[in-house]
Structure formats: structure tokens, C-alpha cells
């Protein structure tokens, strides 16, 4: 699945879309099916495993130098929080590069990437975990669960830079409701499994 967040640090801030794969397999799909018109900048913890976080720049923005510092901080915090090692550290270095600078070949493991040019890579420091920022972002999260690769493929065919902005805006309510139903189903299944386990334990005790 793929997660979509909205970075809007203040009431009057211009909203930015942040995208992140749930795991290394979805991260590979984002690398494979993204396209230049999306204008993505990629964030990843330096020297540690972490989430692959993408920030969508606006059409008139070329680099992170054009982005409000508060929005960059949101991306840094989200990336650091999705690193097991980095999340425990008081400070963590984050690698930043445009999506089109990522290199992926068939010999690499899922989640592994290299770069076409190190000159296009930058590093920024992220401080200690900021729960205020992370809680704000979590409230905006929308989950694309079904037909992920097909949807990414459809987007790439259009070459529309605003495909996912429009998609999330049009389908937000349905996607949120679908996620709620999945959580309920998962909770019910967990209860059912526990009941089955308890019944087996009771049967074993009776046999003894």
C-alpha cells in the first residue's frame, strides 16, 4: 500500500503532498512507476534503513531551496520516524535527491537504490523526534490499498503531474472508509483467532 500525507504546518500554509510506501516492495513500485512530471523529491535516512518519502514540488519549484523550511522539516521528521535506528537517535542525517536521480536495476534487492549523479544528492540533519509534527501528519494520512500498481501505472500513462493530488481529493472519503473497514475486519479476525486458541487450550486441559 501507499500512504499519502498533506504537509500544511499552519492554517495559512500552502499544502504539499507527501507520498510514502508502506514497505520496501511499495517503495520499489514508487521508483518504477513515478515519472518526471510528478516533480518528486526523495528523502531517505543516510546509512540506515528507512521509509522512502517523496515530496511533490509545485510546477514552479525546481529544488528544495524553493520549499518552505517547515514543509522540509515535515519530510525529515516523517523519514526519520520510519527508520528503526534513526528514530532512536537525537539526530539523523537524511539524504535528499530528485526522483529522476534514483537508479534501480534488476540486481538490487527490494528497497535498494543508487544514484545517477552524487552531485544531485544533498544531506540535511533532522533533530529529535517531534511528535507534534508527526501527529499532525498522521491525521492527514490516506491509504491507497487496492490495485496499487495498476493505479500507479494508470498515472504514469497520463503523465499528469497532479494525478495523485486529484485522485486523493476525489476519493478521500472512500479511501478513509475502506481503511476503517479493514481495521474492523482485522480486529474481528484477531478476536476470532484468540477465541479459537482459548478453545484449543481448554480442550487440552480437559484431556489432561
UniProtKB/Swiss-Prot annotation:
Q: Which organism is it from?
A: Saccharomyces cerevisiae (strain ATCC 204508 / S288c) (Baker's yeast)
Q: What is the lineage of its organism?
A: Eukaryota, Fungi, Dikarya, Ascomycota, Saccharomycotina
Locate the compositionally biased regions of type Basic residues: 185-194
Give the matching InterPro entries. Jlp2/Ccd25, NFACT_RNA-bd
Q: Which family does it belong to?
A: Belongs to the CCDC25 family.
- What is the first-listed, main subcellular location in coarse terms? cytoplasm
GO cellular component terms attached to this protein's record: cytoplasm
Q: What's the gene?
A: JLP2
Q: What is this protein called?
A: Protein JLP2
Q: What are the record keywords, sorted?
A: Cytoplasm
Q: Where in the cell is it found?
A: Cytoplasm
Miscellaneous notes for this chain?
Present with 3060 molecules/cell in log phase SD medium.
Q: Which PANTHER family match?
A: COILED-COIL DOMAIN-CONTAINING PROTEIN 25 (PTHR13049:SF2), DUF814-RELATED (PTHR13049)
Amino acid at each position: 500500500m501507499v500512504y499519502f500525507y498533506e504537509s500544511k504546518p499552519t492554517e495559512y500554509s500552502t499544502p504539499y503532498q507527501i507520498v510514502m510506501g508502506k514497505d520496501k516492495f511499495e517503495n520499489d513500485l514508487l521508483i518504477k512507476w513515478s515519472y518526471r512530471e510528478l516533480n518528486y523529491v526523495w528523502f531517505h535516512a543516510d546509512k540506515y534503513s528507512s521509509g522512502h518519502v517523496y515530496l511533490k514540488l509545485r510546477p514552479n519549484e525546481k529544488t528544495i531551496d524553493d520549499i518552505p523550511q517547515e514543509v522540509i522539516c515535515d519530510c525529515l521528521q516523517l523519514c526519520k520516524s520510519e527508520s528503526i535506528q534513526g528514530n532512536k537517535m537525537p539526530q539523523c542525517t537524511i539524504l535528499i535527491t530528485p526522483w529522476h536521480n534514483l537508479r534501480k536495476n534488476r540486481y538490487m534487492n527490494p528497497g535498494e537504490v543508487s544514484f545517477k549523479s552524487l552531485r544531485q544528492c544533498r544531506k540535511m540533519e533532522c533533530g529529535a523526534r517531534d511528535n507534534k509534527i508527526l501527529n499532525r501528519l498522521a491525521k492527514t494520512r490516506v491509504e491507497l490499498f487496492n490495485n496499487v500498481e495498476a493505479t500507479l501505472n494508470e498515472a504514469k500513462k497520463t503523465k499528469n503531474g497532479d494525478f495523485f493530488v486529484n485522485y486523493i481529493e476525489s476519493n478521500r472519503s472512500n479511501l478513509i472508509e475502506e481503511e476503517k473497514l479493514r481495521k474492523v475486519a482485522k480486529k474481528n479476525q484477531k478476536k476470532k483467532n484468540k477465541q479459537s486458541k482459548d478453545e484449543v487450550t481448554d480442550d487440552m486441559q480437559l484431556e489432561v
